[in-house]
Amino acid sequence: MKKLILLLFTSVVFFNSHSQENVSHTSKTKVFLLAGQSNMDGRGDASKMTKQDKKELKLAQNNISYYYKGTTNNIKEPIIIDGVLDVTDPWQYVKKKFRIEKCFGPELFFGIELAKKYPEEKFLFIKRSEGGTSLYGAWNPNWTLEKAQLKKEEHKRKLYEDFIETVDSQLENLQNGSYEIVGMLWVQGESDSGNRYGPLPTETYAENLTSLINKVRVHYKVNDLPFLLLGVGSNKVISKMKETSINLSNVTLIERSFNSYDENFTPRYNHHWNGKPANHYNYTGMKKIGQLFFENYFKFYSNYIK
């Protein structure tokens, strides 16, 4: 009888310690923030996804919750996804322009790779994006009417403010202490490139990006929050991203290539729409972008997921 009691006690102790070990490893939901313009929105053609892609997405959906708010010009109602990681049913003009029915952004294959590497973890992705928007104007954390007017964005939403409100509203659904913010992905820069509206958007890009990063970190009380930038836009804008990544800790610039021989090759659509190149990253390009985000996060910041 004493042996039986001892055996039961030992089993209970082992079970409890084993359960606590699992809880300590998986108890907190890991939150990623995503923001930017149309290439963060994503135009990757979901119909090109392979059977293996779909299988891996289905597995990732067990681990990754996903909230997405996307807006666009002249359409009042946003696209909202509030569920698990998935592809997007976009606006009709996007379907026509890119000859697609459904699409995806960097989050999809970033999430697929993340779930494969961390099958025991739970994640929440919160994404806020709007195409054709600048950091100088709509995304500026130090928004002014004058800056917005310079970029013809005075009638657009104050996107930094809206981004914070969107993230806050989703975090309020979680219990205090049940989550930790472990990274932010930023895909934006095209609208600050060129000289159509003068040199200021490009010249002040590093200053505005630094302000955005610092304000996000302060607001969410994560002073060393990993911040990953995709190098998009003009060479001058990308050089400003590089400058920011050198001057701030835990900021990584992800370089992509249009050379098909490079490992970081990110091809774009090659057809025209209304007499202009459609541009934007296609299935292969957007898939690679998601994978590049994961590779860089895992290389530099894997210690944030424990």
Spans of features found by a protein language model:
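Cell-envelope and extracellular/periplasmic
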Residues: 21-306
